[in-house]
Amino acid sequence: MATNKVKNAKSIFVANVKGGVGKSTLSIMLARALAEKIPPQNITVIDTDLQRTATEFLTNSNPEINVEFLPITPAFENTNISLVQQFIKQNEFRPGHVVIVDTPAGSSQRLWNLVAEGYCVLIPTTLSNADLYPTENFIRSMDKVKARYAKSHPHLVVCPNKIPFGQKDFSLMAERLKNHDVVIGPPLRDLASVRHFYNGKMENWENK
């Protein structure tokens, strides 16, 4: 995302009902990449996953990025979803700021209604049917929310993740998603390269 593209405040959700597809890793990578394009203090990562993956990593690696830990669990769902919603509303009046929300796995309808209020949803998934099937169901639920409220946002971007090097055939994914209003982003290759990029500092987060 180029600097001149971040004039208006943006809320980006990283979401999928399926666990283990790389939501926290993608949130970390996105925050670090944006920190090279815009002032890091203009970036807030809201970690709603009880595992605290994004919180623990970014607090140590990029303390200049704002991190808020608001776990969305059955015990705290109503309160913390309301707090996340408040953050997003406040962010709308802060031009040049970006909020990244790392969401947990699960099927909370209230959470997905909140996700639908964002500017963009990044949806990581592997190419396996075990991940593509629930991913398609999640996209279908987002389509329904957008249709119900006649909304053009959020933009849905599917992020092929954990892709082996040399893998070039994405026809299975394209076929599964052809009837949905989504964009398929560039593949994120095997995370061994990511760990190398972080000079060994990144632990085994791929199942977070």
Feature locations, PLM:
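P-loop/Walker-type NTP enzyme "switch/lid" segment
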Residues: V6-V21, I28-V101, A105, Q109
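Structural beta-sheet core signal
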Residues: T44-V45, V101, I123, V158-P160
